[in-house]
């Protein structure tokens, strides 16, 4: 895989913390002209062959076969569409797009052009998640799932003072659902598939959900997914069933450990990440699929992302949360 990276912000710097540990060649990096100094610094530190302040120019570089998009949410669809049109595979930061219709258009085009799209979401590639998936049948009939990712945002104080940064900006497809609850949604859909119905209630300020509660009805069991950027509390996550439970005090963002406990038995502790960077496992999965040209595996990943975006889009409709980017299709 020969990677071209788009962006020079926090998530790109997080990616670069571990990317040299996997067999990916860093070819190019692109951002805005205002970020030129950052780009040159990253080139010096990480050995990029090319630096661009024009995304379209980077897409013309034939040495780049895959583009990683670490840009604001509202730019995901436009940037991904251009990459596909330039015959590039894509690693697209979560959330996949602003809405389901955008996601569907990207997936259909990728299939048509025989290209791969990977959503960069750590949760479902985490070894602990895969172990939970393996242990799930031992619990019997699932009855209740509760997931809670509440984290007082470092940007919320500024937000209260009127400074609206991307994570709280509806114009940039931000909010608690898109930024935090998406990890919970990926977790539950990864284990159980799509629900029969969803509902969403939220605390709204400046046209954005600063916190909210998403309910998902699976018929035989119910799930409550909580996310908040305007308050914080200890993380509590539990799958409750008639023969046992699986629980963790780790958010789905990192899922560093969990406990598996059957009725009348002591809990068994699991921590299978080997202290690896939280994003490393997903990129190892992407690389394996890419190198094997396993389009069936990638299609499964894309279908999973579509299911997540369908839930998010329906949840937003429950609170009339509209993004300007919704018109971009």
Question: At which residue positions do the language-model features occur?
Answer:
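Predominantly a Rossmann-like dinucleotide-binding segment in NAD(P)-dependent oxidoreductases
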Residues: 126-195
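C-terminal helix-rich "cap/oligomerization" subdomain common to oxidoreductases
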Residues: 66-68, 285-329
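N-terminal Rossmann-like dinucleotide-binding module
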Residues: 1-46
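Beta-loop-alpha module in the N-terminal Rossmann-like domain of NAD(P)-dependent dehydrogenases
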Residues: 5, 15, 49-109
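Contiguous beta-strand/loop segments that form the cofactor/metal-binding neighborhood of enzyme cores
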Residues: 184-254, 284-292
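Rossmann-fold dehydrogenase core element
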Residues: 105-123, 141-144
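Hydrophobic residues in well-ordered beta-strands that form the structural core
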Residues: 52, 92-93, 117-119, 248
């Amino acid at each position: 895989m020969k990677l071209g990276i788009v962006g020079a912000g926090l998530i790109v710097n997080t990616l670069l913390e571990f990317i040299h540990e996997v067999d990916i060649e860093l070819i190019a990096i692109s951002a805005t002209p205002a970020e030129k100094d950052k780009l040159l610094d990253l080139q010096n530190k990480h050995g990029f062959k090319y630096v661009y302040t024009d995304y379209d120019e980077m897409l013309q570089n034939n040495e780049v076969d895959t583009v990683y998009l670490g840009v604001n949410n509202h730019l995901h669809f436009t940037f991904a569409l251009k990459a596909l049109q330039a015959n590039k595979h894509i690693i697209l930061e979560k959330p996949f797009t602003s809405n389901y219709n955008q996601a569907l258009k990207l997936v259909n085009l990728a299939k048509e052009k025989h290209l791969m799209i990977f959503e960069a979401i750590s949760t479902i590639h985490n070894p602990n998640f895969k172990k939970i998936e393996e242990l799930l049948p031992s619990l019997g009939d699932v009855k209740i799932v509760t997931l809670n990712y509440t984290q007082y945002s470092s940007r919320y104080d500024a937000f209260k003072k009127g400074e609206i940064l991307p994570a709280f900006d509806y114009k940039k497809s931000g909010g608690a659902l898109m930024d935090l609850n998406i990890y919970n949604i990926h977790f539950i859909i990864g284990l159980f598939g799509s629900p029969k119905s969803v509902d969403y209630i939220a605390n709204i300020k400046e046209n954005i959900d600063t916190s909210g509660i998403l309910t998902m009805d699976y018929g035989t069991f119910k799930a409550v997914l909580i996310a908040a950027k305007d308050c914080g509390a200890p993380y509590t996550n539990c799958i409750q069933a008639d023969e046992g439970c699986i629980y963790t005090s780790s958010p789905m963002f990192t899922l560093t450990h969990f406990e598996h406990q059957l009725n009348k038995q002591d809990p068994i502790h699991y921590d299978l990440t080997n202290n690896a960077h939280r994003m490393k496992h997903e990129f190892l999965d992407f690389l394996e699929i890419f190198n094997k040209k396993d389009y069936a595996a990638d299609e499964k990943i894309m279908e999973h992302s579509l299911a997540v975006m369908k839930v998010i889009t329906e949840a937003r409709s429950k609170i009339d949360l509209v993004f300007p980017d919704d018109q971009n299709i």
